[in-house]
């Protein structure tokens, strides 16, 4: 296997594993984690009290991994750009995220878009330019999706 491909697989696997390890503790303080789970030493189910992942099975990934893989698929598709460089179309990405959230809602998931991404996409839905709507966020959603960009 090409070492670059192996490294890409490793980076994405590491992202998914870290996400699955953190899934049951999203938005919980250290004290809450200790009270609900005690010491976590491996993959565990999301507790019923977990606000974003109640009852999610151990090893499940969250919106962070799903959206990173969405970025990866769009980057792969963008390799056919006329410049020969990797390209990620902002409009296509915005619409893909909207479709992703709609599918999550249909499945009954509580693990949806974060507030900054949601606010930006609501502006896209209202007809604003996707290249100008994301500058006011205060959350870390973009950092959760950046791994494929580093690989590209």
Segments (PLM) and residue ranges:
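Structured, active/binding-site neighborhoods that engage oxygen-rich ligands
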Residues: 1-152
């Amino acid at each position: 296997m090409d070492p670059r491909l192996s490294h890409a697989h490793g980076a994405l696997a590491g992202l998914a594993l870290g996400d699955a390890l953190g899934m049951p503790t999203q938005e919980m303080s250290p004290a809450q984690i200790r009270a609900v789970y005690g010491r976590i030493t491996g993959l565990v189910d999301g507790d019923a009290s977990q606000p974003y992942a109640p009852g999610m099975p151990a090893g499940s990934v969250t919106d962070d991994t799903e959206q990173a893989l969405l970025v990866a698929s769009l980057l792969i598709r963008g390799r056919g750009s006329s410049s020969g460089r990797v390209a990620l179309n902002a409009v296509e990405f915005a619409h893909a995220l909207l479709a992703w959230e709609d599918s999550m809602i249909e499945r009954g998931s509580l693990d949806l878009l974060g507030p900054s991404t949601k606010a930006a996409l609501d502006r896209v839905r209202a007809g604003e330019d996707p290249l100008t709507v994301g500058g006011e966020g205060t959350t870390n959603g973009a950092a959760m999706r950046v791994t494929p960009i580093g690989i590209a």
